[in-house]
């Protein structure tokens, strides 16, 4: 059932200065109390003296505020507007006009309807200025809340989120009422539904029903087309159309286990329990800065289809603070059945609650006690990249930058070929210039953050390989350059001749470097100064205990050893 409270304006000559005082009307199931206006079946205005009117007034007349109520909350109506603010109200409407007898009659009718019917929402329509009405309503709430008489107070029941057979019957009953009140035949309705602008023609009706059922208008329009068997919709299962629009984001059992593992790790690092973690999630004043690290880690581990907003919503619902008595509220068999259903369906709480005969909130409150913790291997497997995933990632980056970067340069990056460059940043795209959300969506198995990190790791590895290859290339060139000078091998006779030259010059010298090598080069021009010095050093170092022996003595011993060898060796 839908209750609507309309605040409308009797128009006089289409000018704002001549507008009369607002009047109200309320309606339920087609019955209405008329106050100068007609409340139609699909919540639209039928204005008396319907002539030309300003565009701004037209726009304001179509505004609608929908209020959702929690159980046992009391709300007061005055002049057709809420005075006591509901916990999840979107906006408030009000008027500065004094309360009239008509207003009081409407308020009384509203109170009786809510007391006697399982209503779940109230629609308030107003044509007054939005900003001024909200301001007036807030001031009225502050000043008048305690002064409103108890006769103008009532309790409203909370809306159920799950799509049940009762909701389906209710929706079909509203469709039948629409046909009856509007005197529309079934054939005429089919003609309306076949029109591509059917949503606009039935906008008021769909808005009213959608606000009660908590479903999208497009989904309900599909339901109507399937119900009336409009061409192209005959084979659609009308029983599943509204259910497909589950308001809860679905997490698999493995996803839930990974979340539990990360949350427990966070609690361990922060030194808090799950109850305190729930307070941090539910209260912005207790929100801890390290929560961002928790979100980032979960986004890296969970599928790309799950947004940050979805993760936050899951954490708030599953880990909200609980009364200690709720810990053992369920039997062990019920908890096992809950685990089995989540394993089969994921976290589709509405469907699971129907099968367990309880509420979605109760299922969510107990889920933390049975989800358990995932193994470390599960998280490690989600973090690791396979060769196929890495190759696909690089191909996606390569294809997205094909027009901006030379193919050969990109190929050398992604295949790790021998490709030297003095400035790698000029050769490959920077990490912050890549649309990682698009890359992640195409890859399908990793989050945008994980893709970015893996790409940066690849760049770092490539840069390191490039530097090593460049260093090795320089060494090869240097060795090749030395070989090009015609370097010859030292035979025993050559080494003996070298040491004899050194022996004549060493005298009291204590180091090979103190020898006049330029003079020796003149005597042995086939070798360079560096080559002769290196050969002499090696020959002296071959003498046992040469470090503790005078240079002249070491040279003498080396000469003696060389003379015992064949000269052509």
UniProtKB/Swiss-Prot annotation:
> Where is this chain compositionally biased, Polar residues type?
9-26
Where on the tree of life does the source sit, at the highest rank?
Eukaryota
Q: Which UniProt keywords apply?
A: DNA-binding, Nucleus, Phosphoprotein, Repeat
UniProt entry tagged with the keyword Repeat:
yes
Which residues are recorded with the post-translational modification Phosphoserine? 21
Where does the record place the region Disordered?
Answer: 1-26, 133-159, 459-487
Instruction: List the SUPFAM superfamilies hit by this protein, alphabetically.
Output: Homeodomain-like
- Kindly list the biological process annotations in GO that this record carries: termination of RNA polymerase I transcription
InterPro entries per the record?
A: DMTF1_DNA-bind_reg, Homeodomain-like_sf, SANT/Myb
**All residue ranges annotated as the Myb-like domain in the record:** 322-371, 377-459
Give Gene Ontology CC terms. nucleolus; nucleus
SMART domains assigned to the protein according to its UniProt record, in alphabetical order: SANT (SM00717)
Q: Could you tell me which Pfam families the record lists for this protein?
A: Myb_DNA-binding
Task: Tell me the protein's name.
Answer: DNA-binding protein eta2
Regions of compositional bias (Basic residues) in chain numbering: 474-487
Q: Which GO terms describe its molecular function?
A: sequence-specific DNA binding
User: What species was this sequence derived from?
Assistant: Schizosaccharomyces pombe (strain 972 / ATCC 24843) (Fission yeast)
Please state where this protein is localized: Nucleus
Per the record, the gene is: eta2
Q: Which PANTHER family match?
A: CYCLIN-D-BINDING MYB-LIKE TRANSCRIPTION FACTOR 1
Transmembrane ranges? none
